[in-house]
Amino acid sequence: MFSYFRKSQQKVEENQNGGGGDGRGSGIKVELQTNINSRDLKNEHSDPKFKFSPLRSTDVHLEDYDNEKYKLKFIQIVTRHGRRTPESNRTPLTMWMCNSMDHLISNKDSPRPNCNPGQLTVLGIVDQINVGKIYRKLFIDHLGFLDSQYNKDQIFIRSTNTTRTISSARSLMHGLYGGSFTDEQEKSPHHSSFLVKPDNEENMYPRNSKKLVFLKNLIKQHPKVIKENQLSELEKFTEKINKIFENSKPEESSFRARGFRSYAGLVNSFDCFRNNGLPIPKGLTKDIIQRMYEESAKEFKSARYFPEMSILGIGRFVDDLNKELKLKARNDPSVKDLKLSLYSGHDTTLAALLVGYDMYEDKIHPVTSSTLEFLLMQDKDYKEPEVVKITKSIEKELINHQYVKVIYNHKPIHIGPCKDKEVDGMCPLSEFLKISQSIIPTNYDEQSKLTQLDKKRYLSLIED
């Protein structure tokens, strides 16, 4: 049984004066696991000053999910996995602490197994358990939206085919239906009950079709990107970071990324060290780190200059989400009991959705354990027709009384093309479905092809 974590005194407190001070009402109280027993977890590689804490806000506001006018009908949650090890083995992976997949929640491994590249760390597991505990307080204890015991008919779970996303889904579900990280009995559903698509069908993150690869490279030459980078003196900032890596001594930090090709890649590698308690080069100050995250977000956001990047990158997953959402909206018998769908993905999953819907309001790269929620809300005073068969007219009536609210890391965000049509901060479902259609490919295989005419057309766009 794990002895690594004790219950923390850190809580998401109920605030009688309006939650987290933003005037959005009371938050919910959740006891998170944050204290580290340094004797058990830290090793000779760890930063002695490191203290484990959540990487983003855990303050949840009840009125975002249920109020006097609207009720929650269904929710889709898309997550980024928890803290992980680097995907390369340039640094000895013995520096990180991991569990085996067989003993993910309750540690029965003796001796502790070596980590694999890109694997969820012990801290990553705790991250996801904490996310699950927050959702338990919200959906079970406060709203009574989900049954207190796991009901497979109420919850659908899908993960990409990587150990870190599968482990993240299992850990989140353990927090939702289990307890603490020290439980011997894992109470979450086993990963064999998740939907994991074969690699050739996976669409939860951008796949490298010929056209998408071409556009990814071309976007760096887009006049707006070049101008923005010039105004921010990005080249000078990049040189500064490379100089820090050049001057960093091996005994100071094992983290090296000199000559990095993208800020998204840099941030992902950096997170593996800093967020797992390993030392980083001294020259990387808080201001520099903050800008690294901002530059990564700018890279993701640049995809908006070529809408095809969203269509090819995340459009098929948007189609999956929308088909499910529409079935629930029209009360299809196949999803009668379904209340929550969990999709365990990556930073590129979240970033692509945020860009595709023009709702990337945050200034930084999606941190590990981030959550993006699509809430299907319905008018509380609307009485659904009691019919056996849903006709087109009844479907339209149902849809007209439903809305989509989007919440990113427990903060409502807004879909760009829907801002002038919002109702109480939500996008009418009919509008949401229209906007989604603009992101969904009509024929992915054909649209992924890259002809010489395509190349000329795109090159002419950046030359104008």
UniProtKB/Swiss-Prot annotation:
Superkingdom classification of source: Eukaryota
InterPro entries reported in the protein's UniProt record: Acid_Pase_AS, His_Pase_clade-2, His_PPase_superfam, Histidine_acid_phosphatase
Active-site residues, Swiss-Prot/TrEMBL: H81, D347
Coiled-coil intervals, chain numbering: none
Pfam (any one): His_Phos_2
Reactions performed catalytically: a phosphate monoester + H2O = an alcohol + phosphate
Keywords in alphabetical order: Hydrolase
GO molecular function annotation: acid phosphatase activity; phosphatase activity
PROSITE patterns (UniProt xref): HIS_ACID_PHOSPHAT_1
E.C. number: 3.1.3.2
Enzyme class, first EC level, given as a word: hydrolase
Annotated region (Disordered), positions in chain: 1-29, 180-202
Segments of skewed composition (Gly residues): 17-26
The family this protein is said to belong to: Belongs to the histidine acid phosphatase family.
Protein's name according to its UniProt entry: Probable acid phosphatase DDB_G0284753
